[in-house]
């Protein structure tokens, strides 16, 4: 038997179902349409129109759903559509009912309908039967250790057992309370004198103790050998100025100097009897005419021709003022009637026909300062009158301080000669002079350090 194609089989089934549905006897046997719609037969009977051939409807694409359940007078929407098709007016006359045909094959199951709304909650049912006991569970973990129970009554003493092996030594017990003091025992006999022990090693030197008071003067000892020569002592304070010595013999006369300039003639004095007597100072004269300013630019240094002279064209004029360092630079200048200032001597010179002549023999000092207080001269490295020394540096720890020789008591520690001077210890303290001590050092009148005030920690 040949197997049909599924598509061909589907077409045959649709044609078969359509032929069955077209017969009203089969439909009436399956579904009582007449009972549900009583006016349908009357409509068909009252219609006496011409009869025509009934063409079967086209087969549906899908087979009709299979009806399950009890027959109900209420029809589904698909059945209503089918009844409307049958209720349509037909020109053919309905014949007599034929015999019922054989039941058709069971159709395929229909698609499930949509879920209806959820119903109301029903009443509580009866309790079910008790289920079987389940398998035993896993044993639980052990619980915490409980509190110890009350101590029971002491039992009776048992029989003496066999002596066992000696056990290990137990822990040392706590120290007991001191016992009562016993009575003093009798004095024992003196033992024999033991042999003399060997001499021990010398111990470590102890800490430096405090200086004790001066003890009584002891007896004079035997003259010892002469010790080595010590280092020279500290320099003493500056002594008082001694008496002036006897004047020495006069020295040899020096070479004759250059002749000085001839001074202006003085006023005629009063006649005298062979002796010159200086008269009294006269009154102050009237002020002279005001001077004139020479403000014109110089034409030439060696031959000046600027400005009008105050006292006529015949008076000499100073063309320029030069600043030189020493005598060599001064001799190189050939400008007549010029003034030069020497830095090494701090003095002025004037150029004359005879050469350079000094104007000031001593340096110039500010007004109000004494000659010995020439502070601007000290430290230039040149020894000048009024200075004991001049090393040209501001160091106060050497032998020359402020152009005076250092001495013990000037307040400055002379490096390499003095240990201290006043409060100048050279950055020394008790902590650095005597390690491990504290306090303040003291300077003696001989410029040496006294460490008596230093104390050690005890």
From Swiss-Prot:
Keywords recorded for this protein, A-Z: Collagen, Disulfide bond, Neurotransmitter degradation, Repeat, Signal, Synapse
Region annotation Disordered: where it falls in the sequence: 89-291
Major location (coarse): other
Tissues in which the protein is found: Expressed in skeletal muscle, heart, brain, as well as in lung, spleen, testis, but not liver. The short isoform represents about 5% of the transcripts in the soleus muscle and about 15% in the heart ventricle.
InterPro entries: Collagen (IPR008160), Collagen_superfamily (IPR050149), Myxo_disulph_rpt (IPR011936)
Residue span, Collagen-like domain: 95-271, 279-293
Modification after translation: The triple-helical tail is stabilized by disulfide bonds at each end.
Signal peptide annotation: 1-22
Heparan sulfate proteoglycan binding as annotated region, ranges: 129-132, 234-237
Start-end of Basic and acidic residues biased regions: 117-126, 181-199
UniProt comment concerning the protein's domains: The proline-rich attachment domain (PRAD) binds the AChE catalytic subunits.
Recorded family membership: Belongs to the COLQ family.
Role: Anchors the catalytic subunits of asymmetric AChE to the synaptic basal lamina.
Protein name per UniProt: Acetylcholinesterase collagenic tail peptide
Source organism of the structure: Rattus norvegicus (Rat)
